[in-house]
A protein has these predicted regions:
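Extracellular leucine-rich repeat
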Residues: 2-425
């Protein structure tokens, strides 16, 4: 009897251990992919280590809370290591010393707060480092120094405080082309934060608590930059015409969801390669007459969700504009033959979104006739008779005078209100 009991107990223990470990499978003799076991797990030597054929290891969401020394020993061909979506709080100095061929390291969505100096000293071939979604609040000077080949760095959704960042942290990584600081507090970052970069292409500063376009993002060495993302900040003014003078290569400028009210008419003119400007969800009431004039590559302008009443064709004169979005503004009319005039002044308008707006019905009628005649794509689906799209007085003609705007806007808001109430009733 005694003997049987012991055997059962031992068996159960073995089972429990077996289930705690992630399960790993090897594909094409070189790609190891693991899935989580039933409990949290400390990675140790033996699970994925000791195989010189392995080139890739995926330990995504494997409930790993710690990595023991030697876990990656004898992986002399390893170039790809995905440790994302685990619960790692610390990486001990030396744990990633072994796989010297490593070029891709994904540590995103863990609970890392900082790194011991020297952690990356042996993985000098690293090209991509994804640290998104941790709690990193400190980057010690020198931590990235061995990473001279670094190309892609994602630091988004961490607890970085820009004003405490040392501007020399990237000094030995001048070839970074992509860097993402979004969802960190980057207000007050040093002006020379990115001074070492020689070929940056994409800079993401979404949700960084910025009150103005930060000067570290517009320095002369950033003339290679193609995308600058400044969305969801608290930028209110763009009034210095020299702001973007250095950004010769910029193709996309995203200023979505700020509180921009005024824009200097010449601020975009240095951006000769700009293709797309996103200004949606700001609070612009007027748009300067020259703002997008003579921009040789400009094809998309999104002004959705502002408070514009007047938009003149002059704003876009000499630019090959294809897509324009004026939806959700305070527009009751546009100038006569707006689209034709756009085309006559260099525009190539193909897609034009203008609903909702507090349109005067007669003006909307003219515009709809025009877009249909010219074969321009518009928000067709919105005109299904299911909700109010315009307002009119007894007199059905388009009044192109600003002093009537207030009246039509009020009428439209009233109609919308009635419509909403009747639907909820
Ligand atoms: C892997 O290669 C190294 C040197 O190239 C060798 O010393 C080691 O024994 C090999 N390990 C395995 C598990 O084959
Ligand atoms: C890193 O892992 C996350 C989550 O598993 C994934 O969404 C992301 O695309 C990976 N990053 C890169 C650069 O491949
Ligand atoms: C505005 O219109 C453009 C096409 O002209 C479209 O690509 C974009 O998504 C629109 N923006 C919004 C917020 O709907």
């Amino acid at each position: 009897m005694m003997v049987t009991y012991t055997t059962v107990a031992v068996l159960i223990t073995i089972f429990a251990i077996a289930e705690a470990k992630p399960k790993c499978k090897t594909f094409s003799q070189k790609d190891v992919v693991c899935t989580a076991g039933k409990t949290d797990y400390q990675l140790v030597r033996g699970l994925v280590s000791d195989n010189n054929k392995t080139t890739g290891i995926t330990l995504r969401a494997c409930r790993i809370y710690d990595i023991e020394y030697e876990s990656f020993n004898d992986l002399n061909s390893l170039s790809y290591l995905d440790l994302s979506q685990n619960k790692i709080q610390n990486l001990k100095l030396g744990v990633i010393d072994e796989p010297k061929q490593l070029s891709y390291l994904n540590l995103s969505y863990n609970q890392l707060t900082e790194f011991p100096l020297g952690l990356f000293d042996q993985v000098t071939k690293l090209d991509l480092l994804d640290l998104r979604g941790n709690k990193i609040n400190k980057l010690e000077l020198g931590i990235f120094d061995p990473l001279t080949k670094l190309n892609f760095v994602d630091l988004s959704s961490n607890a970085l405080v820009g004003k405490d960042l040392n501007p020399y942290i990237f000094d030995q990584s001048p070839h970074i082309t992509f860097i993402d600081f979004s969802r960190n507090n980057m207000e007050g970052s040093p002006d020379n934060l990115l001074h070492a970069f020689q070929s940056l292409q994409i800079l993401n500063l979404d949700r960084c608590f910025l009150k103005e376009v930060p000067s570290f993002a517009t320095k002369p060495n950033l003339g290679t930059m193609k995308h600058l993302i400044l969305s969801t900040n608290q930028i209110s003014k763009l009034d210095n015409p020299a702001t973007f003078v250095n950004l010769d290569s910029l193709e996309l400028l995203d200023l979505t969801a700020n509180v921009i009210e005024t824009i200097n008419p010449n601020i975009f003119s240095p951006l000769k390669n700009l293709q797309k400007v996103d200004l949606k969800n700001n609070i612009m009431k007027t748009i300067p007459d020259d703002l997008f004039r003579n921009m040789p590559k400009l094809i998309s302008v999104d002004l959705y969700g502002n408070q514009l009443e007047e938009v003149s064709v002059n704003v876009f004169r000499g630019s090959p504009l294809k897509n324009l979005n004026l939806s959700s503004n305070r527009i009751t009319y546009l100038q006569d033959n707006f689209c034709l005039e756009l085309r006559n002044s260099g525009g190539k308008i193909k897609k034009f979104l203008f609903d909702p707006n507090p349109w005067q019905c007669a003006c909307l009628h003219d515009l709809l006739k025009e877009v249909k005649r010219l074969g321009i794509e518009y928000n067709k689906g919105k005109y299904d008779g299911k909700r109010p799209v315009c307002v009119t007085t007894a007199e059905f003609n388009c009044k192109r005078q600003q002093n009537f705007n207030e009246m039509y806007i009020d009428m439209f808001n009233d109609v919308k209100e009635i419509h909403r109430n009747s639907r909820s009733a």
